[in-house]
Amino acid sequence: MKKVNHWINGKNVAGNDYFLTTNPATGEVLADVASGGEAEINQAVATAKEAFPKWANLPMKERARLMRRLGDLIDQNVPEIAAMETADTGLPIHQTKNVLIPRASHNFEFFAEVCQQMNGKTYPVDDKMLNYTLVQPVGVCALVSPWNVPFMTATWKVAPCLALGITAVLKMSELSPLTADRLGELALEAGIPAGVLNVVQGYGATAGDALVRHHDVRAVSFTGGTATGRNIMKNAGLKKYSMELGGKSPVLIFEDADIERALDAALFTIFSINGERCTAGSRIFIQQSIYPEFVKFAERANRVRVGDPTDPNTQVGALISQQHWEKVSGYIRLGIEEGATLLAGGPDKPSDLPAHLKGGNFLRPTVLADVDNRMRVAQEEIFGPVACLLPFKDEAEALRLANDVEYGLASYIWTQDVSKVLRLARGIEAGMVFVNTQFVRDLRHAFGGVKPRTGREGGGYSSKCSRK
């Protein structure tokens, strides 16, 4: 059986304890994974602290060269990494291979360039004096990364750190450890010096908690659940931190929208990446005059192909774990109990799966109609392939309903009225507003939200947590 250890100071370090990671589609055991704790974290942080001065003082062009080399190695190994990610997470292979892993490579290429352009500011005081600022790395950074799209998200955190001269300890979710292990290996192969990037496997309550509490960690970057994020903020002390937490993003579709395009984009926004994405458009608000037309949305949801994640034709694979499957399935049952109308999908596993997938964590794309915004399914993050359809009367009601939720990451507006777009973009409580399109990633712009989300990533924003 494959063993997954820690990467500390350039060495593959065995653990004292191990846990099994399994394929969510088949139940097959994939690897025996080291379960780190305080001892491994202390070792990794000490190593990162020791490596920091030399890495920080390495010329930026040399750091950029090593990062580009790492990006090239990822490109050369896309099929292998994508297959590993699909096996570990249940994500469809066409998404990991064609989108998510190539994006990870681009993260290194992008930040290698961006961070060479980061400079302080200079102000002439008079003809004899200048005031100037320096942009400097803070020291050791803790990177706590989630189980959904794990490789891409991990590289999104690692790349700006390396570019700025920061050393890091990466703690991946225990539900998706495999590709982080490969990242640690490829970083060394690319020539990243030992100790600059350390990867410690383990559980959040042990390895993760020890990492964010460590007195030599100067900054924490976390992506994950809101409850965990609040706990980290409480325990982080005076450290700088960036928190990318949950989402319950609204999609506002007005009667003057291009309905066919809106249907396709709304379908993609909620059901791609198995619905396990913080930017998922899970609350779809439809103007009353066109609400009956959205039976087409359920028809399209029923045509989404659910099945073997390794099949290139599969569009929705398996959810990350049995526990998460039970959570998402439970929300579907709850929505029906609360009075929503089930138009597609449902809380049970598909009955037409082949024998080797019968025990997998599969759910059909589910559409709940006639949802009231006060229902729990409309207020709480489900993090799965579940769309809630809600009617609205006019612009004012649409804005009120969209904002009436704890979360504020992304939002999506569909209308041909530019004035309406400008009003809504200003009034909607979301960090990102997409107009007449699904989520489109642009690394130059800030990624982040409002309300419980306190971080910004992308472009120069990614460095704000880890520079001084």
Curated annotation (Swiss-Prot):
Disulfide bonds: none annotated. Keywords: Aromatic hydrocarbons catabolism, NAD, Oxidoreductase. The active site is at E244, C278. It catalyses: 2-hydroxy-5-carboxymethylmuconate semialdehyde + NAD(+) + H2O = (2E,4Z)-5-hydroxypenta-2,4-diene-1,2,5-tricarboxylate + NADH + 2 H(+). Its EC number is 1.2.1.60. CDD domains: ALDH_F8_HMSADH (cd07093). GO terms for molecular function: 5-carboxymethyl-2-hydroxymuconic-semialdehyde dehydrogenase activity. One of its GO terms (biological process) is 4-hydroxyphenylacetate catabolic process. Pfam families: Aldedh. Optimum pH is 7.5. It is an enzyme of class 1 (oxidoreductase). Pathway: Aromatic compound metabolism; 4-hydroxyphenylacetate degradation; pyruvate and succinate semialdehyde from 4-hydroxyphenylacetate: step 3/7. Belongs to the aldehyde dehydrogenase family. Catalyzes the conversion of 5-carboxymethyl-2-hydroxy-muconic semialdehyde (CHMS) into 5-carboxymethyl-2-hydroxy-muconic acid (CHM or (2E,4Z)-5-hydroxypenta-2,4-diene-1,2,5-tricarboxylate). Is involved in a meta-cleavage pathway for the catabolism of 4-hydroxyphenylacetate (4-HPA) via homoprotocatechuate (HPC or 3,4-dihydroxyphenylacetate). Homodimer. This is 5-carboxymethyl-2-hydroxymuconate semialdehyde dehydrogenase. It comes from Escherichia coli.
